[in-house]
A protein has these predicted regions:
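"Short basic amphipathic alpha-helical interaction patches in structured regions
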Residues: 103-105, 121-130
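Short, hydrophobic, well-ordered secondary-structure elements
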Residues: 78-119
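Short, contiguous, well-structured surface segments enriched in hydrophobic/aromatic residues
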Residues: 53-87, 91
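Long, charged low-complexity segments
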Residues: 1-66, 126-182
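Inter-helical turn/loop segments and adjacent helix faces that build the functional surface
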Residues: 94-97, 121-124, 143-145
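Charged/polar positions within long, soluble alpha-helices
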Residues: 90-93, 112-120, 159-174
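Short low-complexity stretches enriched in small and charged residues
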Residues: 63-70, 113-122
Length: 182
């Protein structure tokens, strides 16, 4: 049996394998892949349970939003946010924290746009995140005291997630994700 990849051993291992053998190892890995080894820690299970509870509540919100036909364009964006959140949870469960954070960041951008476009459809073409958050400060859905608090919480979460995207060394976690592959 060939050992799993490690960063140190990758070059020597690659020298002994050809691409077909390597693909067979990857195919075997995919065939036998199981998430069960990721759910053995009770503390992690509680975190996943909390994440799922929030995700489920959001999915109920999106379903009701769509049912009421408030805004078809917003429906599409909120569906995309649902997808972003589910993918983020799936990545987090597997220990892939960076892609999980990146998906959350995408979800935040799409959520803010989905809400703003109810009254300001042209926000859909805006690519500047700064402009999107500025538009949120002026949007009636975020104009209430509660709405403004929510917008601020979302903005703070987005800022924290940006640390991962922009390579802040204080949030880097050298994971051995490659060691999970054949």
């Amino acid at each position: 049996s060939i050992p799993l990849y490690t960063l140190e051993g990758t070059k020597s291992l690659l020298n002994t394998l050809n691409i077909n053998d390597d693909f067979l190892l990857l195919e075997d890995f995919i065939t036998n892949y199981q998430l069960s080894k990721y759910n053995s820690d009770p503390e992690q299970i509680e975190k996943y349970k909390s994440m799922h509870k929030k995700l489920y509540a959001f999915l109920v919100f999106v379903a009701e939003f769509e049912r009421q036909s408030i805004n078809k364009n917003s429906d599409k964006f909120l569906s995309e946010v649902s997808s972003d959140l589910m993918l983020s949870l799936f990545c987090a469960i597997q220990g892939m924290y960076k892609p999980a954070k990146l998906q959350l960041r995408c979800g935040i951008e799409n959520f803010i746009k989905a809400i703003i476009m109810i009254d300001t459809p042209q926000i859909v073409v805006e690519t500047s995140v700064y402009a999107i958050f500025d538009a949120a400060t002026k949007d009636k859905h975020f104009a209430t005291v509660t709405g403004d608090k929510v917008r601020q919480k979302i903005r703070n979460a987005y800022t924290i997630l940006c640390h991962t995207v922009h390579g802040d060394t204080s949030v880097m976690h050298p994971l051995s994700a490659l060691s999970l592959l054949p």
